[in-house]
UniProtKB/Swiss-Prot annotation:
Extent of the signal sequence: none
Organism: Photobacterium leiognathi
An example Gene Ontology molecular-function term: acyltransferase activity, transferring groups other than amino-acyl groups
Keyword presence, DNA repair: no
Protein name as catalogued: Acyl transferase
EC number(s) per entry: 2.3.1.-
Pathway info: Lipid metabolism; fatty acid reduction for biolumincescence
Active-site residues per Swiss-Prot or TrEMBL entry: 116, 213, 243
Its biological purpose: Acyl transferase is part of the fatty acid reductase system required for aldehyde biosynthesis; it produces fatty acids for the luminescent reaction.
Keyword Acyltransferase among UniProt keywords: yes
Stretches assigned to coiled coil: none
Disulfide bridge map: none
Taxonomic superkingdom: Bacteria
Amino acid sequence: MKNTQTSAPIDHMISLGDNRHIRVWETLPKNQEIKRNNTIVIAAGFARRMDHFAGLAEYLANNGFHVIRYDSLNHVGLSSGEINQFSMSVGKHSLLTVIEWLKGRGIDQIGLIASSLSARIAYDVAAEINLSFLITAVGVVNLRSTLEKALKYDYLQMEINDIPEDLDFEGYNLGSKVFVTDCFDNNWDSLDSTINKTKDLDIPFIAFISNGDDWVCQQEVKKLVGNMNSDKTKIYSLIGSSHDLGENLIVLRNFYQSVTRAAIRVDSEVIDLVDDISEPNFEDLTIITVNERRLKNKIAKRNVR
């Protein structure tokens, strides 16, 4: 039986000391008759907040999943820090902190969904800790190449002190010296570094690519998957989509449907897509989006006091 109950997510705060924290939102399963094996963590892409994934969380919850979202440190959103101090390693630390927090609450079976830049972080995390499955959407595999396409220039070829500090990426100041230094110091930059991290990955893994993605090369994603020593991998294409999965409602709905179908299957260690899912209606999605916006604004006002 479908449960169309809508509400705001449960708000949590992970305190880290030094007056820093990570904000986490929890969405409980909307359909209690379906029992899933895993809690799903959603890692949003660069310059995206957790509330940008309200629709996906609702789709997953409508199909029986317990869903966790968070805002990274030094990023946009409700967690501590400014985005001009963001680095891939900070993003990785944030994700690992959320997963450890879940384990501290007795939640050990965890699947991860990551998009865009966060997918590159997810590849590192999946190689280092026990996850049940990994799903990526328009996931970055060659960070240097993606940055060059997005910024229209390969700034990583420059001496660190010559790189402009105010590079605009997705409408935000990247804080280029911090970001680039971390890329080189911790081997985030190349396709080879991603391949080396994931070659021994042996969990169900589904990668969604977009046929109109100008930032991520489909052949590089296929090369990454082809180098994995696993028979639990699959690539699906989101037809008609670019790197921006929210560019229109048709693309967005296809993204929600496809990822939900994938999550249901990999939750049972299968890498095909299930045919039927329970979709929330448009009114429910509108209500949850408005509720999350109100919650975000309420928390943001408290944070500036």
